[in-house]
């Protein structure tokens, strides 16, 4: 019997699920090797677990989602989180620094019908996660690499060095040095191919923190560019803002703002 793959969605935009479909020809080859037992984005057939490999997109933002992810974990041999929402809480984690009750009153005409948590949190804060694929959205080649590794009973190995290394490989002129552009590249993991710096834009941190980051040095770099206080906090509280090293750094800076 073919290995069974499931793809579940929580609070997210569907962009990381679409990377499966963007694989196109590679997806067709993969479909010959596995059974996509549960993948509502791609097919109407839904087969109940257990599953050999489960991919989860999205963060936990409601009480029902918090219960549902536990059931998904119980049905999965390997569980892989995909994308910034699942690995770091996503852009919606900005609510974690705000008053969710105020949002409910302002946004919804009948807030009493809205069942939501006060926070948006990554999957790893609720269950055991076997592997993580970072990005907003994830890179389809990294996704396929993880699938191939797990099917081969090998541990997936994805790059975790900084975007700066990718810029060096591509021969990019450093946007920080040459253009004085604010850039999260020194503390962001590779995976995008240094997309923004290649077009003379600073990195926005879509792929989360690199393993070899130095946040103290990075804060000094921002300060040297005149980026301090609330502006520095805003740059860190982005797509992956709730991931621990960036969250702690932004919170520390925030405490110095008068």
Q: Locations of the language-model features?
A:
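Iron-sulfur (Fe-S) cluster-binding modules
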Residues: 1-55, 60, 65-66, 70-78, ...
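Short gly/pro/ser/thr-enriched loop/turn and capping motifs at secondary-structure boundaries
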Residues: 85-90
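Short beta-strand elements at the ligand-binding edges of bilobed clamshell
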Residues: 98
């Amino acid at each position: 019997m073919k290995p069974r793959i499931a793809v579940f969605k929580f609070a997210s935009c569907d962009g990381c699920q679409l990377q499966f479909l963007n694989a196109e020809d590679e997806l067709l080859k993969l479909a010959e090797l596995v059974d996509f037992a549960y993948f509502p984005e791609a097919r109407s057939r839904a087969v109940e677990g257990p599953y050999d490999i489960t991919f989860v997109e999205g963060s936990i933002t409601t009480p029902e989602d918090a219960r549902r992810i536990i059931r998904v974990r119980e049905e999965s041999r390997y569980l892989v989180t995909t994308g910034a929402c699942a690995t770091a809480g996503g852009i919606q984690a900005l609510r974690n620094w705000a008053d969710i009750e105020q949002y409910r009153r302002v946004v919804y005409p009948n807030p009493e019908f809205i069942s939501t948590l006060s926070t948006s949190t990554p999957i790893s804060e609720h269950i055991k996660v076997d592997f993580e694929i970072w990005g907003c959205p994830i890179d389809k080649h990294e996704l396929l690499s993880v699938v191939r590794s797990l099917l081969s009973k090998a541990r997936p190995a994805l790059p975790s060095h900084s975007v700066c290394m990718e810029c060096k490989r591509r021969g990019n002129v450093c946007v920080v040095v040459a253009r004085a552009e604010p850039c999260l590249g020194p503390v962001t993991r590779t995976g995008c191919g240094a997309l923004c710096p290649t077009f003379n834009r600073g990195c926005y941190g879509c792929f989360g923190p690199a393993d070899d980051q130095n946040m103290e040095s990075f804060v000094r770099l921002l300060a040297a560019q005149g980026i301090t206080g609330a502006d520095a906090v805003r740059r860190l509280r982005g797509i992956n803002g709730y991931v621990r090293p960036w969250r702690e750094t932004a919170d520390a800076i925030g405490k110095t703002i008068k």
